[in-house]
Amino acid sequence: MLEPNKGIQINEVEGEIYLVEFGDGRDKKRFLEMCPWTYEKYLILLRELEGKQVPKEISLWQSPFWMQIHNLPLKSQTRETGRAIGAKLGEVMDVNVAEFGVHWGKSLRVRVKIDIHKKLVRGKKIVIEGGEQRWIAFKYERLPNFFL
């Protein structure tokens, strides 16, 4: 759980929309990086505001999730591959690979901002080197009840 350096203030704006104010910008950055947040396994949607929005115009329809891409050949577990596959599902925020650019493991982790109104994609057929088709499976981390 987040333990802020200089406190957090939460105020209801309208209906189920709340404004969270941080006393320290580093706390806010860390809070947003740790998304998704849940309460009793229900998703809490967060969005950084500019301050110009009217409460009724605030759209909350995306949330970041870490997904694992399974069944990729080892040499394909790169930042570029993660970005290309992740971009088909949403906005890619991060690909978890070493600094030298390749991940040697059973899956490649990609952080993707997903539209919560769409069904989750469980996998996809891709063409790998040599023209072979392969099914790659997607597993999502820390899914809330909303998606189950």
What is each model feature region?
Residues M1-L148:
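Glycine- and charge-enriched interaction patches
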